[in-house]
């Protein structure tokens, strides 16, 4: 990892998670009888009815947008970033996730008169293709805030042997980006937080690049500012199709969200 430019923090993170997996530490398990469902979550409509709409743009002006874009679209037949997958046709043009994301940002900037910087958290597998899209878009411009940060990379591990896998014909396949939890150390080490604070931004709206519904919202920005909370998450009801991914529960002992 050090030969690939990874920091001490990245190496320590990987070592810790590897040891947890190898040792099957009990502390890494969440027992069903120790948690309870999350209830009484206010709806977006409820939030909309309670905010001061005159102040909402002020909160939105202090908000930046970060898209998690480190994963490949291999399950969809792509060997590039998932955000490059065409998802709709508009005026005889195929629109990709990334095109719609850029459109959402440009629309918010124009309609509300805010800067709304966009940063992609790319991986070593997605950076080149997605940055080419941003840099060749004649309408998208941004200064002072980086358009991308690069998350860490770590060796792929064989579930059977616990050892790094080997692909002599294509060594790049021996490496992968970590999961979304890598976000926190990446934004810390990249200097993104310092850059945002220097430009007066206080809030960071984060969502996956393939989640077009989770777009920046002045309503949520104002609600977040009103609560004074350090962290807020927007959730949706799970359906039978939502088999992948986790869900939010509350720790019975502490009330902490997990």
Question: Where are the predicted features?
Answer:
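A broad "ordered helical/assembly scaffold" signature
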Residues: 16-18, 70, 80, 141
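Low-complexity, highly charged intrinsically disordered N-terminal segments
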Residues: 1-48
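Domain-scale recognition of functional cores that engage charged ligands
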Residues: 40-64, 75-258
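Conserved phosphate/anionic-ligand binding catalytic regions in large, soluble enzymes, centered on
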Residues: 69-75
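Low-complexity, intrinsically disordered regions enriched in charged/polar residues
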Residues: 5-11, 66, 177-181
């Amino acid at each position: 990892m050090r030969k690939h430019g990874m920091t001490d923090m990245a190496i320590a993170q990987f070592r810790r998670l590897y040891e947890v997996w190898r040792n099957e530490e009990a502390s890494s398990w969440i027992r069903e009888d120790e948690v309870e469902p999350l209830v009484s979550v206010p709806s977006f409509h409820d939030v909309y009815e309670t905010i001061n709409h005159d102040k909402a743009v002020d909160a939105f002006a202090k908000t930046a947008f970060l898209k998690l874009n480190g994963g490949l679209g291999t399950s969809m037949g792509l060997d590039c970033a998932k955000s490059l997958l065409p998802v709709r046709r508009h005026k005889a043009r195929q629109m990709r996730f990334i095109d719609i994301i850029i459109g959402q940002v440009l629309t918010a900037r124009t309609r509300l008169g805010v800067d709304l910087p966009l940063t992609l958290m790319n991986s070593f597998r997605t950076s080149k293709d997605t940055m080419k899209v941003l840099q060749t878009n004649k309408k998208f411009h941004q200064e002072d805030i980086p358009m991308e940060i690069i998350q860490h990379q770590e060796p792929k591990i064989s579930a059977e042997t616990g050892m790094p896998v080997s692909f002599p014909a294509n060594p790049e396949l021996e490496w992968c980006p970590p999961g979304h939890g890598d976000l926190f150390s990446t934004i810390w080490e990249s200097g993104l937080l310092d850059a945002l604070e220097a430009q007066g931004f206080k809030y960071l709206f984060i969502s996956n690049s393939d989640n077009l519904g989770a777009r920046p919202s002045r309503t949520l920005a104002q609600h977040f500012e009103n609560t004074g909370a350090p962290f807020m998450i927007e959730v949706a009801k799970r359906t039978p199709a939502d088999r992948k991914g986790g869900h939010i529960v509350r720790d019975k002992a502490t009330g902490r969200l997990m």
